[in-house]
Amino acid sequence: MDEIQIASILKSSELFPIPQGVKLSYGTAGFRGDAKLLESTVYRVGILSALRSLKLGSATVGLMITASHNKVSDNGIKVSDPSGFMLSQEWEPFADQIANASSPEELVSLIRKFMEKEEIAIGENNKGAEVWLGRDTRPSGESLLRAGEIGVGSILGSVAIDIGILTTPQLHWMVRAKNKGLKATENDYFENLSTSFRCLIDLIPSSGNDKLEISKLLVDGANGVGGQKIEKLRGSLSNLDVEIRNTGRDGGVLNEGVGADFVQKEKVLPVGFGFKDVGMRCASLDGDADRLVYFYIPSDSSEKVELLDGDKILSLFALFIKEQLNALEDDEERKQSRLGVVQTAYANGASTDYLKHLGLDVVFAKTGVKHLHEKAAEFDIGIYFEANGHGTILFSESFLSWLVSKQKDLTAKGQGGSEEHKAVSRLMAVSNLINQAVGDALSGVLLVEVILQHLGWSIEKWNELYKDLPSRQIKVEVPDRTAVVTTSEETEALRPMGIQDAINSEIKKYSRGRAFIRPSGTEDVVRVYAEASTQEDADSLANSVAQLVKSFLGSS
């Protein structure tokens, strides 16, 4: 790193002094916190993103300014790798180091050492970095984006491009498309969604001459960017009657009593929904539209809702994909293709039982989207979801190539109208509709809606796939959370010695009992999850396991 480059970083970093007493950590959600404290962090992540682009041959990297389902006064920053997925975990320690560097001189020193280790060069013979920056609708987003731009620009030869107000999944999709050499504007994103949705609608089997009556879908936009974007998309969608509430244009506050996180956790109606909506099909997006849950109001005598969470969405997707695969001829390549679903230990046991009953390969991953994504990528078709509504479907390049050849082969044989050809076409359309970079509430809504139309199901019928087992979660404060070590799937405790045997003894006392413990990633607590055939038993099992944690670790 030459003197001109060092001077550039020293000069720009003086604009963004680091706040005192704040320690930040880059997690699954990137950096998050009070927006007033984040300018220096976003500036420094701008530097990191430019270095990441240079490391990967000047591929386009994305920066998203959002705090997802957090309150409106918060904000955050996360990086999209050129693949459209999250920042490589190998770079997360460097993100932590530079975000917490106490002075411009320490920042330069850390950057210099990292560039030497990663063999990153800046100079005339190297093409500059390219970083695309997007933000959600938070008032703090504009000034934070400018800090990110200055950070990118402090690495000589780098270009920062502001691509506007977007959902998080839009930014990831656009970065992925750009690096694959495809059209990558927001309009291209919408065109891709509407075209693949229409294709799937056209492939819905007709039952005689009867047309399926399509009821209206009510969407809770969380007063965020997702509601505004689905408004924009609605005009190009036939076969979908959508009413959007909580768009943020009518004075509602982002994520306050609205949104997927609120509905999933509280299991009550979001603001703007009431007894007039009894029996209606409702969907709720989160603040940056990367999570999706469905719900309906079963009667006008309660504010409680029937929730269809990420587990139910995963089950619907898996059922549909399995149906299409079953329609394909069992040639050698089809037999070898693997469909798998990935869940976390927090997935309701009833959903896991249902998926296994379908004959699917069910695997568990550590909590956190990045861990599920990696596991899902091991399959030809991998479907992953967390109960909170974050998830997607991944198709391997080799399986997509096989689908293309299969479609051509069937057409050449004059079997273009066969059920097998339709199944191949549906799978290809799903691979285009679904956002294979990250979970995307907009593409998720469209896929749920087209599958329900395909099956001729109401939301109540969908909800009957299985009945959730009652569950309970408890946090236990402990002196040292690191004393608990679990398996990689977090389903069993390896340490302290003997605690898992004690947990197993408690589980055996309850019908359909299941329980596990895991240390929190951010605070000195151990999280307890328990489920059983009745709520009373789930509560009792959770309390018993919490007592075991206290007796093995002590309580703080």
Swiss-Prot record:
Reactions it catalyzes: N-acetyl-alpha-D-glucosamine 1-phosphate = N-acetyl-D-glucosamine 6-phosphate
GO annotation terms (biological process): carbohydrate metabolic process; DNA repair; UDP-N-acetylglucosamine biosynthetic process
Pfam family, one: PGM_PMM_I
Pathway: Nucleotide-sugar biosynthesis; UDP-N-acetyl-alpha-D-glucosamine biosynthesis; N-acetyl-alpha-D-glucosamine 1-phosphate from alpha-D-glucosamine 6-phosphate (route I): step 2/2
Cofactor: Mg(2+)
Binding sites annotated in the UniProt record for Mg(2+): S68, D286, D288, D290
InterPro entries: A-D-PHexomutase_a/b/a-I, A-D-PHexomutase_a/b/a-I/II/III, A-D-PHexomutase_C, A-D-PHexomutase_C_sf, AMG1_II, AMG1_III, PAGM
Bound cofactor: record note: Binds 1 Mg(2+) ion per subunit.
Superkingdom field: Eukaryota
Binding site for substrate: E386, A387, N388, R518, P519, S520, G521, T522, R527
EC numbers for this chain: 5.4.2.3
Sequence positions bearing Phosphoserine: S68
Family: Belongs to the phosphohexose mutase family.
The protein, known as: Phosphoacetylglucosamine mutase
